[in-house]
């Protein structure tokens, strides 16, 4: 997240990219595993945003995402949203089984709300196109997510109901609504961005709902892209998400 924050702020010098690659070389292989395909997707997104190949230090970080084992569908829904965004940045179609898993998640009623997951998933779905028949299904999934996020709106930010808005949820929700929402929800996203700016502390940091230095740092680096044009994991840096299909249907040129 720190690397993506710097890239979103226009820090694209060779020194930064050297630091990113050094960090990936040291930690990437243990982060990207068969049990954590979402981690592979996150590294893939970071490398693509930096304009770098997705194979580094002898490890092909994109391969677990493009091959997408069934075990990936048992990971958290947030990871599946990361898988979608990595595929979209690669210009690859979304596997039917991944889209079905996401549809099942949206159709179910989770025990609690997950605005961060729903917001990132909405951003990912905003790049998926299909035939007129299939598009109805995509539109319905997005509408269901928007409805859930309506319930999670707290003043001009987002968070769990009865807990108030929080920075990290708002950093995921605002870009998603801006990509996929109607005019009213786009306006909410812009207001959410303004709310986020108002949370900055005197020392420049942003507060987290968990009080610790590590969580404060995470909230801060996740806020930076949103403040700079409602950027998120799908749009930061080079190789932004492209319009893709489910299982490879080729859209008319006007939709690409």
List where the protein language model places each region.
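An alpha-helical repeat/solenoid feature that recognizes helix-turn-helix modules
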Residues: 1-14, 31-56, 71-96, 108-143, ...
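Low-complexity, Gly/Ser/Thr/Pro-rich intrinsically disordered linker/tail segments
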Residues: 232-256
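Buried hydrophobic core positions in alpha-solenoid tandem helical repeats
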Residues: 20-24, 64-69, 102-106, 145, ...
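Low-complexity, intrinsically disordered short peptide segments enriched in small/polar/basic residues
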Residues: 17, 62, 79, 99, ...
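Helix-turn-helix repeat elements of alpha-solenoid scaffolds
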Residues: 14-21, 55-63, 95-101
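Short linear interaction motif-like sites in intrinsically disordered regions of transcription factors
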Residues: 159-161, 196, 250
């Amino acid at each position: 997240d720190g690397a993506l924050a710097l890239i979103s702020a226009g820090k694209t010098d060779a020194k930064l990219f050297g630091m990113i690659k050094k960090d990936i070389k040291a930690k990437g292989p243990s982060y990207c595993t068969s049990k954590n395909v979402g981690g592979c997707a996150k590294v893939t997104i970071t490398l693509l945003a930096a304009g770098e190949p997705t194979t580094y230090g002898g490890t092909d970080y994109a391969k677990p995402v493009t091959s997408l084992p069934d075990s990936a569908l048992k990971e958290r829904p947030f990871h599946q949203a990361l898988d979608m965004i990595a595929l979209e940045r690669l210009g690859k179609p979304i596997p039917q089984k991944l889209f079905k898993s996401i549809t099942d998640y949206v159709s179910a009623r989770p025990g609690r709300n997950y605005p961060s997951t729903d917001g990132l998933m909405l951003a990912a779905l905003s790049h998926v196109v299909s035939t007129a028949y299939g598009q109805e299904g995509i539109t319905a999934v997005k509408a269901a997510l928007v409805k859930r996020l309506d319930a999670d709106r707290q003043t001009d930010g987002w968070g769990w109901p009865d807990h108030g808005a929080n920075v990290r949820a708002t950093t995921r929700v605002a870009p998603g609504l801006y990509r996929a929402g109607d005019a009213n929800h786009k306006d909410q996203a812009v207001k959410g961005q303004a709310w986020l700016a108002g949370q900055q502390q005197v020392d420049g940091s942003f507060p987290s709902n968990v009080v610790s230095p590590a969580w404060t740092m995470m909230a801060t680096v996740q806020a930076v892209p949103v403040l700079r044009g409602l950027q998120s994991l799908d749009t930061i840096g080079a190789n932004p998400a492209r319009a893709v299909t489910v299982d490879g249907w080729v859209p008319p040129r006007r939709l690409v």
